[in-house]
Amino acid sequence: MLSLSKNWNTLIKPNKVAYENFPETNNKAKIVVEPLERGFGLTLGNAMRRVLLSSLQGAAITSIKIPAIEHEFSSIPGVKEDVSEVILNIKGIEVKMHVAEKRIMKLKATGPCVVTAGMIETGHDVEILNPDHVICDLAKDKQLEMELTCKVGKGYVLSTNNYEDNLPIGEIAIDALFNPVKSVTYKVENTRVGQVTDYDKLIMFVETNGAVLPEMAVGLAARILQEQLQLFISFEEQEEDKQVKTDALPFSPYLLKRVDELELSVRSANCLKNDNIIYIGDLVKRTEADMLRTPNFGRKSLNEIKEILAKFNLRFGMDVPDWPPENMQELSKRYEDSYN
């Protein structure tokens, strides 16, 4: 009978996720995931993008109240913009809440001045993430008072859905963008595993409003997908599928990986091949001094390999019990999923 686990164990899995923040801000990041099976870059990239832009919890202003103003088609004495323009500007205020319950913030300003989001009195439970954002222009000797209600939610909610049955007279519900993720783009490139060069590399660019870091946003999106897909797994693994998990090796399964599957320079790869070093287990048993005695193998090649070994928590000069194993090829095939 065909082993069920071969449906997923024989597929290559990404062995690293690299996060790179842009120097000017922590709110933008480049995320690189590799290697992936052919086509999985597009599949995962599209799914992650849709979840990031639609399903993460965030905070937004959902209604405002201005004394003597009953609807959005009014004008405010001393304010250059009408209420509709003021509401449009308020929708651009980015907030972060530390509590789940709604909070009411207050704004008081005296002209002449440009009223900005940083003038809002928030308290300890709410942060304004873009304090320089302009709300309106206030004329000389004029005053502006306003109450702003802030809530937690997800996605984009129209003002009609923010309207509550008990909304006080004069309080105006507004559209709310709760999502903390501002933009997500991705692209798929080829990457190499060993001698195979047509695997996928997924590169995502994520920008948030600062309420959550891009790395955290990506992790939350992945968890949402995991929770949604879990229900589809309607079978139990067979005993033979679990056997690989229960068999214990006296050494790390990474040692069973062939060195020609590492992304080494041509010089380093040729030196290892000429010295009959086939598996990582063969490599880590050598000391640095042993390696430097290898013909054409210099300090640059040594540092290159040390950096790669460090990714697997390995180093030169390791004491590896029971190496090499008698059934090397069988073990290498069995534990292939563990180190890919």
From Swiss-Prot:
CDD domains on file: RNAP_alpha_NTD
Coiled-coil zones: none
Gene Ontology terms for molecular function: DNA binding; DNA-directed RNA polymerase activity; protein dimerization activity
UniProt-listed Pfam families: RNA_pol_A_bac, RNA_pol_A_CTD, RNA_pol_L
Keyword Transcription: yes
Domain of life: Bacteria
Cellular component terms (Gene Ontology): cytoplasm; DNA-directed RNA polymerase complex
HAMAP family: RNApol_bact_RpoA
Subunit note: Homodimer. The RNAP catalytic core consists of 2 alpha, 1 beta, 1 beta' and 1 omega subunit. When a sigma factor is associated with the core the holoenzyme is formed, which can initiate transcription.
Task performed by this protein: DNA-dependent RNA polymerase catalyzes the transcription of DNA into RNA using the four ribonucleoside triphosphates as substrates.
NCBIfam families in the cross-refs: PRK05182.1-2 (NF003513), PRK05182.2-5 (NF003519), rpoA (TIGR02027)
Family, as annotated: Belongs to the RNA polymerase alpha chain family.
Protein name in UniProt: DNA-directed RNA polymerase subunit alpha
Species annotation: Rickettsia rickettsii (strain Sheila Smith)
Gene symbol of the encoding locus: rpoA
